Regions:
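Core catalytic region of metal-dependent phosphoesterases/phosphodiesterases
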Residues: 1-104
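Conserved beta-sheet core of the metallophosphoesterase superfamily
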Residues: 67, 94-110, 119-220
Length: 221
């Protein structure tokens, strides 16, 4: 939560704050420490019930911190390939917990692509496990549920994760960004020699001009 607090403290006092979990918030998805689709063995050192409890506590506290600063908070909890089921119950948990909080909007759908239009700026999100980075503008532009927002936007910003290292691509009317992770390497990544700098981005968007500022937060531990 220290990184979340640092991110919130570093932002201007905007009317709207968006909390985006790009997926894989939970490393595994049930009582067995396996990826849900590929059944690949994952490294873990605790009971799933404890992981669930920590996930709920951290996300709840992050939402509470944001509600203290912003007039409205938008919450995105994207499906990841490691937490297909976990992303569902975490999203539902926050929606139910804050059912009487009109200042919180939870983007609650099972479709693993998510979007929010801020004036003429469209913000799009997908973990990156179903569509490659270069094809994401086509997915969001052609998907019927997003077509109207895409047409009414001057620019679209698409955010993905999955690969844990940074990339930026501007093409087809969109800027697509692949984000790093706050998580440290597990033994799988370490043994394969996979390295990337940990971090999270805090991006400020204007309703007309799109991105106007950004800050990178690096975890201290």
């Amino acid at each position: 939560l220290s990184s979340v607090k640092e991110m919130i403290d570093s932002t201007p006092k905007s009317k709207i704050g968006m909390l985006c979990n790009l997926g894989d918030f939970l490393h595994w998805d049930g009582l067995e420490q396996l990826t849900p689709s590929g059944k690949n063995l994952l490294e873990g050192d605790s009971r799933y019930s404890r992981i669930v409890d920590i996930a709920m506590t951290v996300m709840d506290e992050a939402v509470r911190m944001m509600l203290k600063k912003y007039e409205k908070v938008v919450f995105v909890c994207a499906e990841g390939n490691h937490d297909i089921a976990g992303s569902i119950w975490l999203r539902k948990f926050i929606r139910k917990l804050y059912a009487n909080e009109p200042r919180l909007e939870v983007i609650d759908n099972d479709f693993p692509y998510y979007a929010y239009r801020h004036g003429e700026t469209m913000l799009c999100f997908h973990h990156g496990h179903k569509a490659k980075m270069g094809s994401l503008p086509k997915v969001f532009a052609s998907e019927p549920r997003f077509r109207e927002d895409w047409g009414q936007s001057k620019i679209a910003y698409i955010h993905s994760g999955h690969y844990h290292h940074e990339r930026l691509l501007e093409d087809a009317g969109a800027i697509t960004e692949q984000h790093p992770t706050l998580a440290s390497r597990d033994s799988y990544a370490t043994r394969l020699g996979l390295m990337s700098q940990r971090g999270a981005k805090v991006i400020t968007y204007d309703a007309t001009d799109g991105e106007v500022a950004r800050i990178t937060v690096r975890p201290k531990t």
